[in-house]
């Protein structure tokens, strides 16, 4: 009887995962229709819906299991036996890796993230690594130039499943051909093979054609973002063939792609060749499997720890008033714990901070907000904590610590990609690096605002610089929707004495923001002030912010590109493409 119960529980969990991934694919499959209809609000709703599906189905399975087991008492080894039976169901299962993560989620929900051991959880996968390369059907089609790149591109583009007309296909083919000729010789292109993914990758207002360009013994990305013109016809905005550009397109600060992937492991392996700098976790997250990406992220952390003797240290930079942040010197992640008590000037609660982080997870991050992974009961050996960090943890987050003898459990934390804090970057930057960073910072603010996100605290210390030189926001405790903010001009002083007073001569409500004040706390450095005034003076004007608010209220969804403005065909070729409301 007991063995039958363990099998029933294992089958219930796997069937629950089947239901979840079926709904995941169903929402994903609707991406083409949403794109063709230019239904951008539906795109945003689908993104949130797909993220919520996982936790919803975990909850359904947990309730089923409670009904199955009732009030029965089980011995301590019962969860281990269920895991063993579940493992036996996976060798022939096509999505075994995410099914393991789903099992972990159900276990954690049932047992409140306690007793997280390899005997009861899939800390590492139970299946051989080679299974990731078992592809039952090709994920891509091959196209060869045979000396005529334009003809090959015509065949490739007219073979796409999109049902909208092209605005000017011959023009786009000329643009792509020119871009290829600027990067490769005629001889290289004549013998090149283009491997094009069968599925388009949808995100925001674009459908991405993703491919591999094989030239001799080398492989390059081949990425074409397809957009709508104002008249509803299709056009291609650029052609990207460098791995650095591809890495940014699939970056950790962007929303997850909608790509139909019934075999996600196969898709991840296919992408790896053109995204060699991405970890397995990042690739799963890029295609929308963020919960399994979280599992892989933890596995990458464990692998690093097993091969290193480094101690955790307090992260470099200005200490936060809300978050305690620590890291490992050679690891590319930071760990963020919400402090038990905040500085007096921070009028937020822990629940509000967590809600802000969830908002970022669900919102269009437009390449400007870092993704985070949330963990509970994160166990660390005390010997791996520097004395300074251990003292800081005991001082700032004692309510979130559980002493386990030689180890310590942190009840809740976020893991996030490590970046160079912008304030530290600017201290070391030369003139050109400083100009580039300020341009990026202003663009980040504007793109977030266009996506209906107001950062709140805009100090440089709350932004980071990635290895590609992009500026990304990572401090979320004060973010809110743009439409919730009241942007005001500072009223003129009534008397000369007003300007000398310690208190403002005008009333200030909680949601009031005065953009004129940004100049004072952002532009203390004369060099930075000059560049800021040159590039982003509009950020100091309340009218600019109110104009953005009105566009949002009117239902306008901005175009945000995953590449610099100068990479657009309209900029590179000197020819006009259809007008878009870009904030690139």
UniProtKB/Swiss-Prot annotation:
Its EC number is 2.7.11.5, 3.1.3.-. InterPro entries: AceK_kinase (IPR046855), AceK_regulatory (IPR046854), Isocitrate_DH_AceK (IPR010452). ATP binds at residues 315-321, 336. This is Isocitrate dehydrogenase kinase/phosphatase. The active site is at 371. Bifunctional enzyme which can phosphorylate or dephosphorylate isocitrate dehydrogenase (IDH) on a specific serine residue. This is a regulatory mechanism which enables bacteria to bypass the Krebs cycle via the glyoxylate shunt in response to the source of carbon. When bacteria are grown on glucose, IDH is fully active and unphosphorylated, but when grown on acetate or ethanol, the activity of IDH declines drastically concomitant with its phosphorylation. Disulfide bonds: none annotated. The gene is aceK. Belongs to the AceK family. It is found in: Cytoplasm. The keyword Transmembrane does not apply.
